[in-house]
Structure formats: C-alpha cells, structure tokens
C-alpha cells in the first residue's frame, strides 16, 4: 500500500517544526510559502487473494475516460494532491487553529431502496416509449449532490428493455434509471439485493455493461460478471480519507446462484465478510458496510441483524447502513474495546409503489437519507464526527405531480391529500408520517459524538 508523506508526521514532530519555523520567520521577517505534498493513489480496488498474500493494487481510468454528468474528479481525490493552507507564522500561533485547518472531513449520504414497481415505470414512460426517471429525484437531488460521497441501494436489476421491463415479483428496470441516478448525484451504486438474480446472470451482465459503457467512473458494488473483480474490495479516497465500502445481501429469493457464475452476487457469507473486513482494516482509514438484511415490514432490527452487526463491530467496521425491510428501523451506536460503530439498521424505501393495501402501507413510503460526517484529525485519527437522518416520503400522483421523493420537512398537507397511497392505506396523513419517524427515530435531529481525544 502506498503511503502519503504527510501522514508520517507525528503531532509532536509537527509542533516542533512549527516552532522552528516561527523562530526562523520572526528573525527573517518573512512569510512562509504554502507547502504542497504529492503522492499516493487514486480510487483503488484491493484483492482479497494474491500470490504473495498482499493486497493487489490497480488504478482507475484517467479523467479522459469519464463522461458522467457529475465527475468524481471533483469529489474523490483523483490526483491525491494535498495543499496545505497558507499560514502566516508569528510568535502568537494557536496550535488548535493549525490542527483544525489540517483536519479533513467527508460527508457521506445514502438513500434506501429504489424499488421500481410497474406503476412507477408506467408513470415515467414518455409518449414516445422512452423513459425519464428524473422526477423521482427532483426534490432531493440538491441534498444528494451536496455529499462528498453519495450511495444508493438500487434494489432492482437494470437489465434493459431487451429482457422485458417488469415489476413485482421479478423486477427489471430500463437503463434510463441509471442516468437519473447519476444526474441526481450518486457516486456508489449498491446492487447486492434479493432481486439481483431476478433476470438471471444476463441481468447482471447487462447491468454492469451499461455502467461500464455509459458511466465508467461510477462505483458499482455487490454484483460481478467476472471472477477477478469478485476477489476485490473497493476503497475510495475522498479528501485524503481512504474509505472501504462493502455490500452484501442475505440471499436471492430462492433463485440459485448460476453454476457458471458462482461469484456473481455478494452474499452474507461469514468467512468472506470477515476476510473483507480484516483486509479493509489494513488498507483503509474507515469502513462502511451496506448489508441487505432483516425482516420485511418490521420496524425494529431482528436478532439476525444484531448478530451480524456484532461481527461487523468485532472486525473493525465503522459505519453500517442497512436496507431491505422496506420500512425504517432503529439507529444504534456501539462501542467495544475502544472501537465505535454506528448502525442504521434500515433506512427504508426511497422509491416504491406497492400494490398492497391496508394498515402499514404508509410505512413503505417513508424512508430516510443517512447523513454522516467523517473526520480525520491533525494526528491522522479517523472517526465519525456527527450523524443525522433526513426523513423522506415518496409522493405518488401520476397525473399532476408524478412520482417524486420529498424531504418530509418540505412535504405539505395538500400533497399528502393528493398522494395515491392514501387510497391504499386510509391512515396515510402527514401527521402519521411524522409520528412514524418520531416513534422509530425520535424525529430528525443532528446527533454528535464527543470529539475523540
């Protein structure tokens, strides 16, 4: 693993250097020029297995191959060029100010399931037969694109029209949903879900081919069309913080893994998960796990999820953001042997339109955007500085306002009355949406950890 020069400075050495510069500058009455340090690597993948038992390293394509509407070159530190702030050195230097200036932060956001039931597909289909899914994210894209690193759980496979567009129970989405995800600001697409094999191996191949062709800079996780890629874990560098991101599903709805592609879906296999976490602990500063787990429509995490969260904690995971239950679940903070881990057990559906009716359907259109700030302090220690949850509601009104997700705080009584889900669940009201959030999450408020010493 390539080390960056500036990381080798200890706090005591840095303070000594600052003191030395102070004396020199006071004597010469000169201003210190900014220091620029180069070195390191781009976004990287590291192999679980190599001939000499060391991580393998590969570099992502250069910027000339990138054609996303939102290039990661602006967000993920592709040059690894670290420029220190200009500091006028005097005899009255405040070390705390220098430490704060040299610290780094990364804002990570993630949304839950993009579950494209047929009424959504039909609403987003244009008169000429093409698809436009931009309305789904029209009221949240500003939030999503503000993150340094934005993740989404793409619940259904994106196999394209050649495999037949379909909804429940075997989903398949057209390619334009990928366009809408990128245009809305997402950088990382989690594909390890129970619907990953709804269209067999062909669905996975089509999905990955489209991502590689249309958006080669977008990071996809959880599905593979070749064995070599399946041996890797993904590590991205954002603002000089190396972040490993792992994605697994509990299963594939009983659809067997193809014998010709036994590696095609990342599942919650204990040995594999532990090996990935241990490798991430060696090569990354911070590890995010995105498990597709739990029991559908249950508003609190299960013992199955808790058992897995203990494994994640024991092997160094720092942040867990769960999906699959199709409803929101509790958020827990764990501490063991000096290690902290934040766990969002389920952030619910982001986009969905179930055909079910009756009490509880309301719960399936309320979700949340996980919002976490990661900090790397002056001494190189990386930890969660603060976290938040931004409640959302999926508005379903094909004729007038279409299908779109709103932050709950911007949702109105008028919109709630127009939401078609109220025809399927008479308890759907704005007040009841807020009550659900209050019951499960205690409302939407920013939560801060005490700063790590």
What do these predicted ranges mean?
Residues 40-48:
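Short extracytoplasmic/periplasmic juxtamembrane "stem" segments immediately C-terminal to an N-terminal membrane anchor
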